[in-house]
């Protein structure tokens, strides 16, 4: 059943059931008072519970952060966050923003009315999908409905064959009748998705022209422009998603930019998109579906940045929040990009996206016993209402947070003392739900909860590393999010990862990622030819045409020519296969031997086999058009003595490999200078996270205030 379409509201960007009770809370750290002439960069990441703000002083490299509750209208939360950071809008040189607005709109199906016009006989392509299921064996599990109900999918007589020959032109009488229906229904957003239009867009363009004649104010998206690729389900669904999100993202971006400029901001509002770049509010109106993975991309970008500052080109990102954990991989300084992703299974969005695996493992994930009597952890979550049992807001089922606070790894206060945790309630829930049914002591039950959570995350890391041909032993683990640093060392031990890195501000690291990106557009075009018979002159001409389109898009976003950069990629596959791999190529291709060599090498790594003697074909070409921004640079601090400052206290903590609790020193991270070394066992607390340093581990603060923990490998 499809939710009824209605007028857009930014209330849809936030699940109001998850609004926190502590509406008055504003969390600040390290106030930054800018003087006249100084400018700052501000990044904002809107989550379901909190809006995180990261502020970088361009002159000193100093960073400070702020948190405010996410509001019903997310724009209010953004402006509240900037205010909480003590930053004036006219001091902001650059503002970038990651948002779940588009993601939530697709999940809830709350967007303005829209229609799809397609080839007669293909009305149900986006509902039939590929015939696969998220859970193959659960035949009773309902699939999510398409973004447009059947009554909102209209058809017209037309046909183009596989080679691009127009067999039947658009029936003009039918087309004008459809225009009459659309006008009568007051629809202003239409997706035109014709079969084989990726190879010849003539009929789609004619249908668009007729609609514009009959309804001058209508907004039309053509599948041949949005995603000119084969496979109609993927192309149709991407175009439909882009159409329904365009007014949502466009209105949001325009209003946010307007309110900020009214307050004195003079620049563009930059919105983070799935590919790891940003687009202006104008660009978001045209390619809104790229915002559907806005939030998770920021964490992956920041993780790579932190790892490279610490001296690691290979890194695995562990972004553990309250409900979920996002995991990504960076090899040789490059994040992995995928074209195969979705917000909900069965409805692909084919814009390039940073490859991030999300699992239901967070601080609020529930521990429970399944029908077979096994201990499970997540994906169910306590959310922010009622939250973990220890929050004393009505929660009854134990969570990872409850286990951590009971074992002493978390203190009794969070968020700078504004949230008090009830350890007794956590213990009772652990005993009732896990301890008694499994015959475990309360401490062993709490340890078991965390071990299952760690096992779930370790399995996810294996999927993004070992499954792709990468050995975790060659990587650093970057642990962040509110809960990542609690589990980082335990996870590294399970996976034999040699080092764990914790950013200076783990809880707002995703917001930092928004400061590290360029304006990017990804253009694709089908180009099917055997490598041996490819016309290189024609191939280069196609690339130049795509680069010119990219140049026009960047110019539309006010990017100067000297700040434009273009990269070319060829998607290759073995003849007869349909899965392909994207291979970078030089600006002017003189031959394809090196590209073919790279293809065989990458195919062997990712799929564990290659066939150097088999014929290879090109199936698609891509251009990434980039408008370069000045990157954020963190302040570099001189290294001081290894001796850390005195701990602020102690408490008994139970660690994984110890048989009893150890009286453990507690450190305030704000007091740890560059060069300081903290010997485990220890717990390091800060405003937005807590770091567990088990016995035998040393936490060292580097010149960028990144904490590095070497993890000895077991024999």
Describe the function of each predicted region.
Residues 63-70, 115-121, 141-143, 281-282, ...:
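Glycine-rich phosphate-binding loop of actin/hexokinase-like ATP-binding domains
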Residues 55-64, 132-137, 147-166, 187, ...:
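Gly-rich Lys/Arg/Thr-decorated short loops/hinges at beta-loop-alpha junctions or inter-strand turns
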Residues 44-74, 144-163, 420, 523-530:
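Short glycine-rich, Thr/Ser-proximal phosphate-binding strand/loop in the N-terminal lobe
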Residues 113-165, 223-227, 513:
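Active-site phosphate-binding/coordination module
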Residues 38, 46, 173-177, 181, ...:
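C-terminal, non-catalytic interaction/recognition modules in large multi-subunit enzymes and RNPs
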Residues 193-239, 623-641, 702, 707-713:
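Terminal amphipathic helices with adjacent charged low-complexity linkers/tails
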Residues 6, 19, 24-114, 168, ...:
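N-terminal glycine/serine-rich phosphate-binding loop of ATP-dependent small-molecule kinases
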Residues 75, 79, 84-85, 224-231, ...:
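ATP-dependent carbohydrate kinase catalytic cores
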């Amino acid at each position: 059943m499809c939710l009824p379409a209605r007028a857009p509201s930014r209330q849809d960007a936030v699940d109001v059931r998850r609004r926190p009770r502590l509406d008055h809370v504003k969390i600040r750290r390290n106030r930054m008072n800018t003087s006249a002439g100084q400018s700052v960069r501000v990044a904002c990441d809107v989550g379901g519970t909190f809006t995180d703000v990261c502020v970088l002083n361009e002159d000193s490299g100093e960073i400070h952060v702020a948190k405010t509750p996410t509001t019903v209208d997310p724009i209010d939360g953004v402006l509240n966050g900037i205010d909480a950071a003590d930053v004036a809008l006219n001091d902001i040189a650059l503002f970038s923003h990651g948002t779940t607005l588009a993601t939530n709109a697709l999940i809830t199906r709350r967007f303005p009315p829209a229609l799809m016009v397609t080839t007669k006989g293909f009305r149900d392509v986006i509902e039939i999908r590929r015939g696969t299921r998220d859970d193959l064996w659960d035949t009773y599990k309902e699939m999510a409905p398409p973004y447009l109900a059947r009554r909102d999918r209209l058809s017209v007589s037309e046909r183009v064959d596989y080679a691009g020959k127009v067999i039947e032109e658009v029936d003009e009488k039918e087309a004008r009748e459809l225009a009459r229906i659309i006008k009568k229904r007051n629809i202003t957003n239409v997706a035109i998705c014709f079969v084989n239009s990726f190879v010849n867009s003539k009929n789609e363009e004619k249908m668009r022209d007729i609609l514009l004649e009959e309804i001058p104010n209508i907004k039309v998206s053509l599948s041949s422009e949005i995603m000119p690729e084969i496979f109609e389900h993927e192309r149709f669904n991407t175009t439909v998603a882009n159409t329904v999100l365009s007014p949502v993202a466009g209105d949001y971006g325009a209003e946010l930019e307007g309110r900020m400029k009214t307050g004195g901001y003079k620049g563009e509002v930059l919105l983070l998109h799935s590919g790891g770049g940003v687009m202006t509010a104008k660009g978001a109106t045209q390619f809104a579906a790229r915002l559907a993975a806005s939030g998770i991309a920021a964490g992956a970008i920041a993780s790579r940045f932190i790892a490279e500052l610490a001296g690691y080109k290979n890194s695995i990102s562990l972004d553990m929040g309250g409900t979920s954990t996002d995991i990504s991989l960076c090899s040789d300084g490059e994040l992995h990009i995928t074209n195969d992703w979705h917000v909900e299974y069965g409805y692909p969005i084919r814009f390039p996206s940073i490859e991030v695996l999300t699992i239901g493992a967070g601080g609020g994930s529930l521990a429970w016993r399944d029908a077979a009597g096994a201990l499970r952890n997540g994906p169910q979550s306590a959310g922010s209402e009622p939250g973990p049992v220890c929050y004393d807001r009505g929660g009854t089922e134990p969570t990872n947070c409850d286990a951590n606070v009971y074992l002493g790894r978390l203190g009794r206060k969070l968020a700078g003392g504004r949230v008090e945790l009830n350890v007794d309630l956590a213990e009772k829930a652990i005993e009732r739900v896990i301890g008694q049914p499994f015959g475990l002591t309360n401490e062993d039950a709490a340890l078991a909860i965390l071990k299952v959570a760690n096992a779930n995350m370790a399995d996810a890391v294996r999927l993004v590393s070992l499954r792709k041909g990468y050995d975790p032993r060659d990587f650093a683990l970057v642990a962040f999010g509110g809960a990542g640093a609690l589990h980082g060392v335990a996870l590294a031990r399970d996976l034999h990862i040699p080092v764990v890195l914790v950013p200076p501000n783990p809880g707002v690291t995703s917001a930092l990622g928004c400061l590290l990106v360029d304006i990017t557009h990804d253009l694709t075009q089908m180009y099917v030819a055997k490598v041996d018979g490819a016309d290189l002159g024609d191939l280069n001409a196609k690339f130049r045409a795509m680069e010119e389109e990219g140049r026009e898009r960047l110019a539309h976003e006010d990017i100067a020519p000297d700040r434009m950069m273009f990269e070319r990629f060829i998607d290759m596959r073995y003849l007869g296969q349909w899965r392909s791999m994207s291979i970078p190529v030089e600006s002017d291709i003189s031959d394809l031997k090196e590209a073919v060599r790279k293809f065989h090498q990458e195919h062997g790594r990712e799929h564990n086999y290659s066939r150097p003697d088999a014929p290879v074909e090109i199936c698609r070409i891509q251009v990434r058009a980039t408008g370069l921004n000045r990157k954020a640079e963190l302040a570099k601090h001189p290294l001081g003595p290894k001796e850390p400052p005195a701990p602020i206290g102690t408490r008994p903590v139970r660690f994984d490999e110890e048989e009893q609790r150890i009286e453990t020193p507690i450190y305030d991270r704000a007091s740890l200078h560059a060069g300081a070394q903290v010997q485990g066992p220890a717990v390091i607390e800060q405003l937005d996270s807590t770091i567990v340093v088990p016995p035998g581990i040393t936490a060292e603060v580097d010149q960028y205030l990144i904490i590095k923990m070497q993890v000895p490998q077991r024999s």
